[in-house]
Amino acid sequence: MQENQATAARENIMGTMDINPLLVKLSVPMMVSMLVQALYNVVDSVFVSHVSESALTAVSLAFSLQNVMIAVGVGTGVGVNALLSKSLGEKNQERANKTAQNGIFLAFCSFAVFFLIGLTCMRPYFYAQTSDAEIAEQGIRYLRVCSVFSLGLFLQTMSEKLLAATGRTYLSMISQLIGAVVNIILDPIFIFGYCGEALSGTTGAAVATVIGQFCGAGSAIFFNLKKNPDIQISFRGFCPSAETIRRIYVVGLPSIAMQCVGSVMTFFMNQILMGFSATAVAVFGVYFKLQSFVFMPIFGLNNGMVPIISYNYGARDPARVKKTIRLAVCYAEAIMLCGFCIFQFAPNKVLSIFAASDAMLAIGIPALRIICPHFLLAGISVVLSSVFQALGNGVFSLIVSVLRQLVVLIPMAWLLSKTGNVNMVWWSFLIAEVVSVLLSLGFMKRIDKTIIEPMER
């Protein structure tokens, strides 16, 4: 009886509530959650920058592999989110429960992989990017802790996706806040040596991060067990389902690959910029942390949008699908406009947060001003990427991402670097985004003809 009431309540929200307030209701908590998630990336760098520029560069070089961990966790969660929402839309409670169980199992599998990577691959990873032993050793200490103790990251990410898929985004937001607050409190305590020299600097930043992740994971697991009646999580007699895992990764793998493409991009961009100076690498690392405050709210918007689209796709309601897409694009563009204004008119203010030296300001101020116009185009492609995933066409998202970040961005950055002017390298972002938007619009036209329009018949 309780299960039927929960399903009926969900149908009232996802299937009948007006799209605009529904999208706001589901997205705003996730947008706050994503902004909080951005703090995980930024807070470490802010405090570490007050230790030394070499420590900041080390954390910047760590970002590529760190982003792969996040990609695996989030991408798997995206697949679980889409399949779980679609199952509930189709009133298939058994498949919804099985999806949740297999999602948690995959979180443990992901941890096992990165545990081994953390023990074996840190040294070659850093020395492939820099010959500066001081930078490399600080990076090794930081990333080894983050990977060996990554279980908190994967459990937190998966548990929050389960909450989001069932419309409980405010609980996901609370778990994010818990983890971030713990991280922010512990960061200066560890980084500046108040817990001993062995746990100071970049090592301390990593320790604070993983403790925050475990706290966030614990709260998210609690909320799923006690506050989420739409799914029943029990591992009594559990056996991994190859079919369920396959369906999760039909959507999830393109998302993982798409984010991993970003890691490959940052790895090679660091190589290109290192040809100018370590300061240029630090500036790029700072830019990536800062732009997360612009893009993360849109990722949160997408997390609220995806279950609405997936649910109404399962319920065959094309009008609600179309309206959700239109509103999401409008909100995304408004957010991107705000980000553009901040980067264009106050770059020195945002760079000063990272104790930027005169050399960093000389490179960073023109860099932020040249890069930020691509924000105005990126809002469209980022939203459409999640639309493709929600409608079971995640491969389109992957194609767009690979084209933008590898086929166009890196070759253009390399060619422009041959001018000997680091400022020219930053124009590659705008060039790549123009190509990305054009391709995304082409794919969306195809999706409309093959998936959305047939639902109207």
Segments predicted by a language model, with ranges:
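Short alpha-helical transmembrane segments in multi-pass integral membrane proteins
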Residues: 1-27, 84-151, 197-253, 309-374, ...
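N-terminal transmembrane alpha-helices
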Residues: 14-46, 50-51, 67-79, 83, ...
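Transmembrane helical elements of multi-pass membrane transporters/channels
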Residues: 25-44, 145, 156, 179, ...
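Helix-terminus/linker motif at the lipid-water interface of multi-pass membrane proteins
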Residues: 35, 39-57, 126-133, 189-200, ...
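Interfacial/gating helices of multi-pass transporter permease domains
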Residues: 47-67, 134-138, 202-204, 244-251, ...
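Small-residue-rich hydrophobic transmembrane alpha-helices
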Residues: 56-116, 153-172, 283-347, 378-400
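Short runs within selected transmembrane alpha-helices of multi-pass transporters and secretion channels
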Residues: 77, 146-164, 172-180, 205-220, ...
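Structural signal for membrane-spanning alpha-helices in multi-pass inner-membrane proteins
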Residues: 118, 161, 187, 191, ...
